[in-house]
Amino acid sequence: MPDTNKKSLGITRRNFLAGASAFGVVAGLGTLAACSPSSQSKGSEDSSASTSASGGDQRWVPESIDKVYDTDLLIVGCGGSGIACAVQSAQNGTDFIVIEKGTMVGGNANFVEGIFAIDSTPQKEAGIEIEPADVVMAELERGQYRPNGALWMDLCEKSAENIDWLLDMGCLFSGVIDDYHGGLFQTFHWWKDGKAGVGYVEPMKAKMDELGIEPHLETAAVSLIMDDGAVVGVYAEGPEGVIQYNAKAVVLATGGFGGSPELLEKQGWNTESLHIVGSSNAAGDAYKMCMEVGAKDSLPYASQSVLGFIEALPVVSMEDAANPINGYWGIASGGPVLWVNEYTDRFNSENLRDISMVMPFHAMKDNAENYCIFDQAIFDKYFGLSDADVEVFKKSLEENLGNSLYQADSIEELAEKFDLDAKTLAATVERYNKMCEKGEDTDYGKAAEFLEPIAQGPFYIAKIGYSFFFTTGGIWTNKRREVLDESKKTIPGLYAIGNDGSMLYRNVYTINMPGTAFGNQVNSGREAANNARAYIQG
């Protein structure tokens, strides 16, 4: 049996600590930051913290300051939600600055395919009618009634107006509205070319230019500045050196923690074989800063957009997502294969992907190791559908990156490849084959169409890792997008939006309600802009 106490990571950890010595600290640098000063925001050079931050209870204080900016609102992060917050803030006439950790705006939003809405103008034109209650109750049921239904109702009620607003901003849609590969309702509004980078980010960037919004790029927030329990700014590091942003309110929009192996591991995921599809800049910077000032931790309840990953196989491209070898419904996703864990137990139905694409990998989370087993007949019928597919698999088997894919002439030999118990694995396969022969899965109710016996060699075994697209949640917030402390009281002046502060889901990202994650990006960004404006105005 494999060592279940392994802690090594299968990828190189990104170094987010460059320049941290200027702060007299080493841990926690970063924040997927976001955009630019408005024409009213002021910048000055200074060698010490300004009086607006002095006397506070901030945990980290830089030894020296190279630049000071004063503004009413600071938006930290210029991805999907940060962009919406910035544009809405500009329309509100708010004096603000937006900073961005990366070299360009958009972040993970560039790869999003569509957005949720009900009762939108395009849906009305297409004759699509969906009741808000149907959406809300379906989501609450899938979340075991743990999410706050008022948050879902808020998203539903504002979604149509958000689509109208996006159209007014110049955003581009393909015109297709569907259920996104078998979701529950036709709520998915596809961006032009199926990419938010084309339909959302570029048009919104043009709108930002029109409004005079200039992001402070390559600027990473390090810590929050506190004064008498309220957030009054951020310390950051960027091209201008160590920067102090004084603000009356701060909105965090750093993209979640999907780019942080450490936080994924803390949440219980095995990160030994890990592929980060989304931006590595989404490294939990907002989460870390909020925890430092006493925010309530919702990391145990945060959700993920996660698929399977076999290291030996090529990384799937968005343009080839349906590839039968390594695509979204490929070998790692389940279907006709057999799943076993480190104890050689079959632990669930292998066609959970019929519920949602992410569900199989939540079923695997509690295991130390996960493997899929199949034979040549299964490969030929389901995976090797073309000469190109066969060649890709053959090459992957020969190169065997990560020692994750093997062929053998017997089940017992397969077990040896991963130091599994040969006797119990053979017994598991035998039991499974008997159910396949009867055409009924009496253990987990797997669909009969996928009950294929593993009987004809050669046999194959692959170790399944995880491919992370993004995470959503981690910071406890309320309907106004305000960050809450351990007593569920607001931390004045602090907001978290998008994937940082989402409270829509509990542990499982219910992708079968198509487009809700990005719907929340836009909705929470606009709401935070409006609520922060009201807070600033008193």
Locate predicted features.
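Glycine-rich loop(s) and the adjacent beta-strand/alpha-helix scaffold that form part
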Residues: 238, 245, 249-313, 512-514, ...
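Beta1/beta-strand and adjacent pyrophosphate-binding region of the FAD-binding site
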Residues: 67-79
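Conserved beta-strand-loop-beta-strand element in the redox core of flavoprotein oxidoreductases
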Residues: 225-243
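An anion/pyrophosphate-binding glycine-rich loop and adjacent beta-alpha core
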Residues: 287-420
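Conserved N-terminal/central alpha/beta ligand/cofactor-binding core
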Residues: 6, 19, 53, 60-62, ...
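A glycine-rich dinucleotide-binding beta-alpha-beta segment and adjacent secondary-structure elements
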Residues: 424-508
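Bacterial lipoprotein signal-peptidase II cleavage site
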Residues: 32-45
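N-terminal secretory signal peptides
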Residues: 1-12, 22-29
